Amino acid sequence: ILLAMAFLTLVERKILGYMQLRKGPNIVGPYGLLQPIADAIKLFIKEPLRPLTSSKPMFILAPTLAFSLALSLWIPVPMPHPLINLNLGVLFILALSSLAVYSILWSGWASNSKYALIGALRAVAQTISYEVTLAIILLSIMMMNGSFTLSTLTTTQEHLWLVFPLWPLAMMWFISTLAETNRAPFDLTEGESELVSGFNVEYAAGPFALFFMAEYTNIIMMNALTTTLFLGALHNPLFPELFTVNFVTKTLLLTITFLWVRASYPRFRYDQLMHLVWKSFLPLTLALCMLHVSTPAMSAGIP
């Protein structure tokens, strides 16, 4: 996962480089493969500066928490076997992603800087709002799945990937994951023009690298989850045996879509973001969820 995360930074720069038709790291070195290693070395040998007015324990704890949560989210994901086969895997993921809000909040508050605090508050509002839609969409999928275990989703989708019957939910889920991971066009927390990089503005070197790593790990995680939920994680009609290969391919394609969106769209305004989730997504997801609850009841439990 850490390796994937390191090379995702490279992939992102390559794609942005190609999209903006300029020389990115796709020129330097052997295909730019040494870039992530150079970045890591550079970030971790710098001196971690700390503002005098900041509160030290929280300042150090926040990036650590962010990164550990980003890694522990991978525990219930089946690829093809989960690390721990949790009965309530989906619930576990929801709970941990809600905890990630705290790391953002603490980092913004502990930095004792106005920019950082505004950025953190935006990030928290955004993450919490979109988590509501994510939870409701997950509920609808669990109706289709019949249990909260992520591994059973593979068996559910052997005949038909859930993205086909649930395509409105899949669209909303994808946009909500974009917002949840604070990516463009929803990267309000990092509005360069007004907030100078947002809640991690006072961080340098190691702790900053931890935030960065947490962000990219979360991106891969969300795409892996999307693959598991909608794209029949390990299933491919042509090569049903290549479990992990199928999984990785789908996740990679989704991640590239994330970067593609980033290169193509301008940033949302804050009020538009909130309008989108509370006035469009929430009513729609609720309606669809009620539909998924009531259809089996109306059709007398015919699966």
From Swiss-Prot:
**Described function:** Core subunit of the mitochondrial membrane respiratory chain NADH dehydrogenase (Complex I) that is believed to belong to the minimal assembly required for catalysis. Complex I functions in the transfer of electrons from NADH to the respiratory chain. The immediate electron acceptor for the enzyme is believed to be ubiquinone.
Query: Which Gene Ontology terms describe the biological processes this protein takes part in?
Result: aerobic respiration
Topology within the bilayer: Multi-pass membrane protein
Please report which protein family the annotation says this sequence is part of.
Belongs to the complex I subunit 1 family.
Protein origin, superkingdom? Eukaryota
The cellular location(s) given in this protein's UniProt record come to: Mitochondrion inner membrane
What residue ranges are annotated as transmembrane?
57-77, 88-108, 124-144, 159-179, 219-239, 241-261, 273-293
Going by the record, the broad EC class of this enzyme is: translocase
Molecular function GO terms recorded: NADH dehydrogenase (ubiquinone) activity
Question: Can you supply one Gene Ontology CC term for this chain's record?
Answer: mitochondrial inner membrane
Name this protein carries in UniProt: NADH-ubiquinone oxidoreductase chain 1
Q: Which segments of the protein form a coiled coil according to its record?
A: none
Q: Does the keyword Lipid metabolism apply?
A: no
For this protein, the Enzyme Commission number is 7.1.1.2
Q: Which organism is it from?
A: Cabassous unicinctus (Southern naked-tailed armadillo)
Q: Which UniProt keywords apply?
A: Electron transport, Membrane, Mitochondrion, Mitochondrion inner membrane, NAD, Respiratory chain, Translocase, Transmembrane, Transmembrane helix, Transport, Ubiquinone
* Reaction equations catalysed: a ubiquinone + NADH + 5 H(+)(in) = a ubiquinol + NAD(+) + 4 H(+)(out)
InterPro entries assigned to the protein according to its UniProt record, in alphabetical order? NADH_UbQ_OxRdtase_su1/FPO (IPR001694), NADH_UbQ_OxRdtase_su1_CS (IPR018086)
Kindly indicate whether the keyword Ribosomal protein belongs to this entry: no
- One Pfam family, please name it: NADHdh
Major subcellular site:
mitochondrion
